[in-house]
């Protein structure tokens, strides 16, 4: 029986770190990957875009000095936030559990999944906010992916050409991806048929657009208020954005659309509550300290109403 006020548990921490729902559904880690920071309050750099594209005079005279250039960065500050949940496991349940069932592990998995889902929603909110993009476009009636007469391939290619760093990833909500992959012109371009039937694969569309990846958000959450009938809603619905992602970027070097600063690792710990139930309960706590950030708006091009019904 655990009697310490708060005792880290290595076994439960391993579950919290390793536990994943279907990784096809959870995409937050792909768009906003984790980077470690040494303090809860941290600094990160934003780099002036023009410095990477301004061409200085590199010619050097026979006895002259080469021209000097300087590289600057705008240092910004941010703070991680704590996210966590508790799950009580009554001693009564532990003592009566079947041999092949561990209520402590089950509680850890359950709250870990909810924490992941909450992170998914936070990241989807960032991706949906048009203020996080230097480039944005509202697709009017007739140009949306749901309109068979539109030309989504041209729309996406021309948008990518407008981005200073280009794009290597297309981020889509499931409804936008369905509209895109069923669009007659996309089907025709990928299958070489008339386009009146079939569906395009992500690999085929990525090849058409010369992108490294197409990431589709499939996760869902209950959007109803507590106590009301469940309303299961896609987390990434209507999201459509071209992104430049760089997994090697961190808060000091490299440019990427966004990342998640994390202080420390995911943790799981326990404490004993003697006042819970007749025999007390072991309370499982899982959490992390992190902050999701969009750090380079120039690395994104967002489309609004891409899958709206005309």
Residue ranges of model-derived segments:
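A conserved acidic, glycine/proline-rich C-terminal tail/linker
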Residues: 258-272
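Intrinsically disordered, low-complexity linear regions
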Residues: 2-26, 49, 134-135, 141, ...
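Alpha-helical scaffold segments that mediate packing/assembly in large oligomeric complexes
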Residues: 91-169, 174-191, 308-310
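Assembly/oligomerization interface modules of large self-assembling protein complexes
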Residues: 22-86
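Short, hydrophobic/proline-enriched secondary-structure or compact coil segments at domain edges
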Residues: 13-23, 27, 32, 44, ...
């Amino acid at each position: 029986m655990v009697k310490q006020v708060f005792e880290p548990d290595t076994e439960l921490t391993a579950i919290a770190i390793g536990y994943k729902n279907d990784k096809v559904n959870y995409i937050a880690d792909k768009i906003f990957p984790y980077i470690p920071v040494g303090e809860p309050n941290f600094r990160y750099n934003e780099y002036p875009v023009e410095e990477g594209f301004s061409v200085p005079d590199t010619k050097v005279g026979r006895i002259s000095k080469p021209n000097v250039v300087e590289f600057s960065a705008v240092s910004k500050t941010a703070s991680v936030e704590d996210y966590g949940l508790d799950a009580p496991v009554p001693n009564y349940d532990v003592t009566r559990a079947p041999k092949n069932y561990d209520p402590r592990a089950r509680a850890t998995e359950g709250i870990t999944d909810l924490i992941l889902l909450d992170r998914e929603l936070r990241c989807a909110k960032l991706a949906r906010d048009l203020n996080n993009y230097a480039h944005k476009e509202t697709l009017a009636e007739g140009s949306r992916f749901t309109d068979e007469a539109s030309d989504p391939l041209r729309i996406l290619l021309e948008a990518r050409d407008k981005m200073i760093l280009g794009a290597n990833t297309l981020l889509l909500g499931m409804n936008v991806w369905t509209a895109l992959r069923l669009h007659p012109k996309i089907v025709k371009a990928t299958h070489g048929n008339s386009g009146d039937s079939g569906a395009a694969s992500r690999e085929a569309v990525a090849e058409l657009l010369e992108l490294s990846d197409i990431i589709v958000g499939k996760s869902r959450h209950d959007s109803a208020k507590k106590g009301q009938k469940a309303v299961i809603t896609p987390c990434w619905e209507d999201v459509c954005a071209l992104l430049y992602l760089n997994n090697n970027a961190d808060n000091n070097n490299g440019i990427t659309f966004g990342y998640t600063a994390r202080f420390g690792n995911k943790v799981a710990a326990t404490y004993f509550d003697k006042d819970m139930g007749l025999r007390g309960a072991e309370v499982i706590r899982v959490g992390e300290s992190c902050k999701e950030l969009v750090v380079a708006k120039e690395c994104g091009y967002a489309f609004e109403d891409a899958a709206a019904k005309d």
